[in-house]
Structure formats: structure tokens, C-alpha cells
Amino acid sequence: METESDDATITVVKDMRVRLENRIRTQHDAHLDLLSSLQSIVPDIVPSLDLSLKLISSFTNRPFVATPPLPEPKVEKKHHPIVKLGTQLQQLHGHDSKSMLVDSNQRDAEADGSSGSPMALVRAMVAECLLQRVPFSPTDSSTVLRKLENDQNARPAEKAALRDLGGECGPILAVETALKSMAEENGSVELEEFEVSGKPRIMVLAIDRTRLLKELPESFQGNNESNRVVETPNSIENATVSGGGFGVSGSGNFPRPEMWGGDPNMGFRPMMNAPRGMQMMGMHHPMGIMGRPPPFPLPLPLPVPSNQKLRSEEEDLKDVEALLSKKSFKEKQQSRTGEELLDLIHRPTAKEAATAAKFKSKGGSQVKYYCRYLTKEDCRLQSGSHIACNKRHFRRLIASHTDVSLGDCSFLDTCRHMKTCKYVHYELDMADAMMAGPDKALKPLRADYCSEAELGEAQWINCDIRSFRMDILGTFGVVMADPPWDIHMELPYGTMADDEMRTLNVPSLQTDGLIFLWVTGRAMELGRECLELWGYKRVEEIIWVKTNQLQRIIRTGRTGHWLNHSKEHCLVGIKGNPEVNRNIDTDVIVAEVRETSRKPDEMYAMLERIMPRARKLELFARMHNAHAGWLSLGNQLNGVRLINEGLRARFKASYPEIDVQPPSPPRASAMETDNEPMAIDSITA
């Protein structure tokens, strides 16, 4: 009898064991399915669970078993318990996703711990408005205000906060004050000030969503530290939670939460927040192992997008450094004031602007451009037209001895063997000018700063500058010299030794004025030395970039020992305190090369603009250097031509045997008359 009773007991125990094992297996599979469905919302839920279980096993001395690989989700989206819970909550409240978890009155009561402050309400409203811009694009304070005013869900307390904080200036001041406060306190927004119709406005350039979330009420952020209850419909499915561990049934039946509360990324509760029972630091309260499970469902955390990356400590440090390196409003004002002062300093005065206007070409610009294709034939071929452009063109010179296959001559119109050179040469095509007829009469090219009567006629003296008496010439405002430096090359003219240059009587020519000294090659350092010996201080340097007949930079020059020279230098020295026009011209001249050692004619117009109506002297000149208002000295000039009576008299007294032209000079120019007393004083001295 006892045997039958024992057998029946064993059978009952075996059946109970089978049922329990099946139930455990069913619940285990259900848990795995639930984790699989939650993994798309919380990607790191499995590692967080394993970490919690591993920590629990270290305290309970039980072996740790990692979570097995999750199966594919088997539940359709519309039947998923989480989706079902969200749908029921939305039907219950009848609001959007933001009001699904927290009542609006409760959100106001928890807003930053200061629900009665209008600033806190306005900051929360502005932060909520900015967070809704996904993806974020820059906006201004006026747009934010319009969005807040047009919000149908705005409560009277929020509208009153806008009015109270804005005061007499209106709600726009409240929005801008809140933005500035948020930028200064935690750097959650990046702002820039601008003006609209004379009124200052604020532009929001960028936002930090992590920091903006802190402006919202705690319950709205999804990271509460209190065990708040979220009311849910009674139709939410309940499950039996075991008292022996995760996935094992127990004797007590409690409503099973769909997810645990706390941080949405880790799923952990805050540490040590239960009234009784020991909890692990920073982990979820394990039900059935330590303490008691809560007798209510836990609140749902806000979903975290799977593509959102957690900010690293290095990124936070960079944000802090960027915030610290930003200029304050006071620094920006000081910088703006400094820029305005610099602008005022560098802005030309009315006198300087009027002086520069005097030297502009009268009648407009008369510059004529050269065609980039050189000849009319190439111009028509490249443009695909039967008519060439209206720019200046060249014409190829093809002689009987020309070999077109050799290409263009390197020296072009400066070639010294034009009659026998086999390379192609060019000349300016004048057919366009002849067909167009005579040009419209325009005013002279020379600027209207000196008349012909003021400048006077050109004067020159053929002499040996090394032994000529410079003291009879008087003093000059401008001296230009192009010495025949000894550069150890074969030149078509004589040169001067270095010591002869150093001992020239140049100091007697000026007391207050400028000197322009042309140098080349090794003579650059010698020229600087001569300026210092003559009593000048070098202040500038002019560069002449040489171009050929086709307006291209020359590549085969006749000067240069190591490299072909495509430029020349002119040193500028100053003595005394002359009156000059500053900042009129530049220090670069681009001009065509002509005869050997001939300098560009642009120099004469430039020097006239720098010191108009001053006496000007050119040393080592040739006949092509003779210009109105200039006195030229050199050994390649045609005799002596002097117009100024005082200068003629002094020259005849010193050199009676030399004839002076013209025999009866015309009336002296006004410029020579004005400078005559100065010249006599220098001779007397």
C-alpha cells in the first residue's frame, strides 16, 4: 500500500517537474523574444543585462551564464506589447508623444525646480521649440517667437510668462533674454547678433541637443530619480515574475514591467534609492533576489535613435574650450572699435583724395588692349568668326630669308640683325585704325596738374659729369640717374668705375628732395652705398618688369650672369624734408623694352605726380631722355640748350668757350623763375 502511495507521489512530482520545466522554457523564450524586439530601440540592452547578472552572480556565488543569441522578432509590430502600451496611452491621454508620459501640470511643477519663475518657463518653451527642428537649421529669435505664439497647445501660464519676462519691450525680449541666458550658462545654443531695420536681433546658429534637454522638466527628459507612477490602461498584459532569478517563476505574481526605468541607454536604476533592501550601485533592482519588486509598472524611457552617438569626454572638452575661446560682448565691442579706428587711419583725407583726383587722366581712360591671339588670322580662327575682335593686333613680317618653322625671334623688334634674321618678326597692324578713321578728339593724355607754360621747355648740357661743376646748376627737388655701371659686360657705351661713382658731386644738387637711382646686377649693393655716401636715406625701391613687343615678359634678356634678367631696380632715396604726394603710384612698372639702357617713359609722369612743379634733373641722359620741365646732363647729348636766363649766365661764366642754344632764349617758365632765387643762393653760399 505504501509502495503504491510512493509511486503516485513520484509520478505527481515528475509531472509537476515537466510542467515547471515547460513553463520555465516558455517564459525564457518569451523573454528572449521581448529582448529581441527591444534591441532595435535600446541597442545595448543585452550587454547591460549581462553586466547586471554578472555583478549579481559575484554576490550570490552562482555561476554566470551569458544571454544567448537573440532570435529574430516573431511578433508583428501592431501586436507588440510595447507598441500596444504606447497606443493605449495615446488613446487615454489624447495628446502627442511628449504628453504621453507626463501630465502637463506635473511637468510645470518639475521644471528646473523653479516652476514659479517666468525665466524657467520661457527657457523650457524655447528649448522645446528648438528641439522640434529636426534636422536643425539656423533660425532667428523672431521665428522662434512666432512659433511659440502660434502654438495651439500653449497654456495660459506659458503665455503669461512671455508677457511678464518681456515687459514693455514685448515677448521678443523674453525670447532673446532666454536664448542669451542659455548660451551663457551651459552653452546649449550658439548665437550671433544682427540688425533688422535698425533693431538688434539674435540668430541661433547651432544647438546642443544634450544640453537643451536639460532645460526641459525632469520627467520630460526620461531620466527621473524618483519612482513615479505612469497611469496605464488595465488591459496591459501582466506576467508572472519569478523569485528565483531572471526567467524563473516563483510563488508571487506581480505585474511584469515591459522595461525597467532609469537611463534609456543602460536600463539601470539610480543607486541606493529603495527604502529598504540592498541594491547594487548603478544597476536595476533584481526581483526575487534582493529586496522586493515594486508593486507597479515602471515608467517607459524615451526611445533613443539607433543612429545617435553618445558624446565622448573629448567632445565635451572641445565644446568647453570653444566656449572659453569665444570673445565676450565687451571684447567684440573693443575689437570693432579698433577696426573702426584702423579704417579711419587708413582712409584718405579729403585733401589726399582731391590731390589724387588731379592726376587722373582727363577725358577717361584711353588704354587700348592687345588681342591675346596676336594676329587677325589667329583671332578669327580661335573665335570661329569671320570678323576679328576690336582689340589691337600684330602683323607677321615674312621676308624672303624668313623660316617660319623656326618660330618667333627672341628679341622681336629689338633684334640687331633684322635684315638677316631668319626668325619671324612682327609689327603693329594699323589696318583697323585706318578703316575706323581718325580717333575722336580727346584731351591730352597728360594730367591737368601742370600746364605747358609752367613746365617750360626741355634743357640739356653735353658734359662729362665726373668733372662738371654741379654747383652752378642750383638745387633740385627730384634727381634721377641711370649711371653706366661697370657690370663686366660688353656694352655699346663707356662705363664708370666704382670709385668714380662714389666721388660724384651729387650732394650739392639737393638739400630737400628725392633721388631715383637705377641699379642692376652687382650694382645694387654699390648703389645703396653711394646713396649713403651722398647723404640720402633709402626709403623705397621701384621694380620695372620688362615686356617685349608682344606684351609678354622677356625670357631671353641681354643682361644677367647667372640668370636672364627680366626686371630692373630703381632705388629711391630721400634727403631733408621735401613736400611730396604720398600713396599716388605703386612701386611696380610694367613697360616694353626699347633701346639698350632706355628706361620707361612712365617714370617721368610718376615723378611729376610725386613732386609737381619742382625742378628736376636727370644725370647720364641721352637725347631721348629730354622732357619738358627737366634739365638733362650727359656726354651723349647734342650740345647745350638752356632756356633759364640765370642758368645761362652762370654756365657762360664758367664755360665761356661753349656755345649755348638758342642764341636768344624765350621768356623763362614760371617754374624756373620761382626757383631762380634758390639757385642764386646756393651759388653764393
Swiss-Prot record:
It is found in: Nucleus. It is an enzyme of class 2 (transferase). GO terms for biological process: embryo development ending in seed dormancy; RNA methylation. Residues 657-685 are annotated as: Disordered. It catalyses: an adenosine in mRNA + S-adenosyl-L-methionine = an N(6)-methyladenosine in mRNA + S-adenosyl-L-homocysteine + H(+). Residues 552-565 are annotated as: Positively charged region required for RNA-binding. Disruption phenotype: Embryonic lethality: arrest at the globular stage of embryo development. Arrested seeds are deficient in mRNAs containing N6-methyladenosine (m6A). InterPro entries: MT-A70-like, SAM-dependent_MTases_sf. The modification Phosphoserine is found at residue 664. GO terms for molecular function: mRNA m(6)A methyltransferase activity; RNA binding. Keywords: Methyltransferase, Nucleus, Phosphoprotein, RNA-binding, S-adenosyl-L-methionine, Transferase. S-adenosyl-L-methionine binds at residues 464-465, 482, 599, 622-625, 635-636. Its EC number is 2.1.1.348. GO terms for cellular component: chloroplast; nuclear speck; nucleus. Belongs to the MT-A70-like family. Catalytic subunit of the N6-methyltransferase complex, a multiprotein complex that mediates N6-methyladenosine (m6A) methylation at the 5'-[AG]GAC-3' consensus sites of some mRNAs. Associates with MTB, FIP37, VIR and HAKAI to form the m6A writer complex which is essential for adenosine methylation at specific mRNA sequences. N6-methyladenosine (m6A) plays a role in mRNA stability, processing, translation efficiency and editing. Interacts with FIP37. Interacts with MTB. Associates with MTB, FIP37, VIR and HAKAI to form the m6A writer complex which is essential for adenosine methylation at specific mRNA sequences. This is N(6)-adenosine-methyltransferase MT-A70-like. It comes from Arabidopsis thaliana. The gene is MTA.
